[in-house]
């Protein structure tokens, strides 16, 4: 196959300028060949000679269809990218004197972040002399972790860094398609539905007789 593109990622055919190569590929007797013989073998099968390991001694070349070879490389790279997990960390800030309304508001958002598969980094920021209440900040963060125990596990316990006391939470299970409730809530809902269906079935099979 007459393809000679020197600007490609891999050198092919006439662009391979070495004396000998190690040949691999289907329907090829693997071994070391001089470059002219390797090209002749590729041409006899109407395929390309593709250099896949230029730093080997001698360089390794594959007898293959170059277009299909590139397609498979791109496909593999795309699959690997899809499998790679992108870790997202959401930050939630508290003050040492956070009231219940603000706390519950941030707790709700933390649940949403965890259900989406994101980690949550919650911290208490101490201004000036409020650092004297660092124990109060630790209690707040531990309460926060306890209220999220159905959604997350503690990756890092509260630690004081400068004016911040931080805790790191990681999701127990990620649901990127929606906000899936905890398993216990799902099971409870299922049991309630089954119970209601059973009662309805009993009523159909044993109708209540009117009182005379």
Curated annotation (Swiss-Prot):
The keyword Protein biosynthesis applies. GO terms for biological process: ribosome disassembly. Gene3D superfamilies: Translation initiation factor 3 (IF-3), C-terminal domain (3.30.110.10), Translation initiation factor 3 (IF-3), N-terminal domain (3.10.20.80). GO terms for molecular function: ribosome binding; translation initiation factor activity. SUPFAM superfamilies: Translation initiation factor IF3, C-terminal domain, Translation initiation factor IF3, N-terminal domain. IF-3 binds to the 30S ribosomal subunit and shifts the equilibrium between 70S ribosomes and their 50S and 30S subunits in favor of the free subunits, thus enhancing the availability of 30S subunits on which protein synthesis initiation begins. This is Translation initiation factor IF-3. It comes from Porphyromonas gingivalis (strain ATCC 33277 / DSM 20709 / CIP 103683 / JCM 12257 / NCTC 11834 / 2561).
């Amino acid at each position: 196959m007459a393809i000679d593109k020197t600007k490609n990622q891999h050198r092919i055919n006439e662009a391979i300028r070495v004396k000998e190569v190690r040949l691999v590929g289907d329907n090829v007797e693997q071994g070391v060949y001089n470059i002219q013989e390797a090209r002749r073998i590729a041409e006899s099968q109407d395929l390309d000679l593709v250099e896949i390991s230029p730093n080997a001694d001698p360089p390794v070349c594959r007898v293959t269809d170059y277009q299909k070879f590139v397609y498979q490389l791109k496909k593999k790279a795309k699959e690997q990218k899809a499998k790679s997990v992108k870790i997202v960390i959401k930050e939630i800030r508290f003050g040492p004197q956070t009231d219940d309304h603000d706390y519950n508001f941030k707790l709700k958002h933390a649940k949403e972040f965890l259900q989406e598969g994101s980690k949550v980094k919650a911290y208490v920021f101490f201004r000036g002399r409020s650092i004297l209440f660092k124990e109060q900040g630790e209690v707040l963060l531990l309460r926060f972790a306890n209220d999220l125990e159905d959604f997350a596990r503690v990756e890092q316990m509260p630690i004081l860094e400068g004016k911040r006391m931080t805790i790191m939470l990681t999701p127990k299970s990620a649901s990127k398609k929606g906000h899936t409730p905890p398993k216990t809530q799902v099971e409870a809902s299922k049991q309630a539905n089954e119970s209601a269906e059973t009662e309805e079935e009993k009523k159909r099979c044993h109708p209540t007789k009117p009182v005379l």
